[in-house]
Amino acid sequence: MRQLGCGTVVFVNGGTAVRPHPDRVGTSVAFAAESACGQLLHDALQAENIHVAQLIIPGAITPGDPRKDPDVLADALWQLHTSRGPYRTFAEPLDA
C-alpha cells in the first residue's frame, strides 16, 4: 500500500471491542487490543493516503436484520473503503 500510495485496511469486531463483557473476557481483551492497534495504524498511515477503519457489529450477524444482514454489512464495509471517514463505525448502536 505504501508503494502504491493508497489503500484501505478494515477491522471488523464485535461490541466487546469497545464495551467489555464479563462473560466474554477473551474477546473483550483481544478485540480491545486489536482496536487500539487499528486506531494507531489509522493515525500513523492517514498522511500516506492509507485508510484504516473499523466496523463494530454488536451481537450476531443476522439475515433479514435491517442493520446486521450480511448484504447490509457488506455495503457498510464498502462505504468504509470509499468514504474514508473516521476510524470507527457502528453497524448499530451498542444499546440496541
What label would you give each PLM region?
Residues 1-2, 86:
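The alpha/beta-hydrolase serine catalytic core
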Residues 2-3, 7-33, 39, 46:
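Catalytic loop of short-chain dehydrogenase/reductase
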Residues 35-40, 46-96:
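C-terminal helical subdomain
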